[in-house]
Amino acid sequence: AKRADIVVFLTGTNYEKPADHHTGTESHDRWIISLPGNQEDMLKALYEANNNTVLVLETGSSMDISWAKENVPAILEAWYGGQAQGQAICDAIYGDINPSGKLTSTWYNSIDELPKGTDSNFDRDGRNGMMEYDIDDWGYTYMYYGKAKHGRQAAKPLYPFGYGLSYTTFEYSNLTAPANITKDDIINITATIKNTGTRDGAEVVQ
């Protein structure tokens, strides 16, 4: 690693092994959101040997990669990309394509920031212990995450819902939206998006 120009470290979770408690599937919830095994230790060792390290994540959901965010210069989330994933990753790293994806979930700093399913505070309507999951009032998920609610301290996510970088930059202008709407209205929102960088790219408007 010390002699390499760039170190590319591919890591993540194994969708075939949900029993490791790091991987969520249709029938298994995760207990842990850190990288399985000694993968973070390996990443730290590689980074110590060569600071010019690229972290490529192959995961099915959000992970606690707070150390990597603070230290690793480049992070690419590849998800489970299928048989052409290798070529797509290489194209993105070499700059042959410009990534434009955005996160579809909030990424947290640690497991401690997630609510417990057994938390009695969720039983807000007294229906025999059934969980009443109100994302607005309790402030646990994506756009509501970060509010101080019910004794819970305000927090800042590791990466917010909709986060994503590009090799270029975009400028938003001329935003128009209706001032008044009623139930069942069709809402038309328009904006002008300008690529202000030097590379071709696509933008997800949000």
Residue ranges and their predicted role:
Residues E58-A202:
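Secreted, periplasmic, or luminal enzymes acting at the cell surface/secretory milieu
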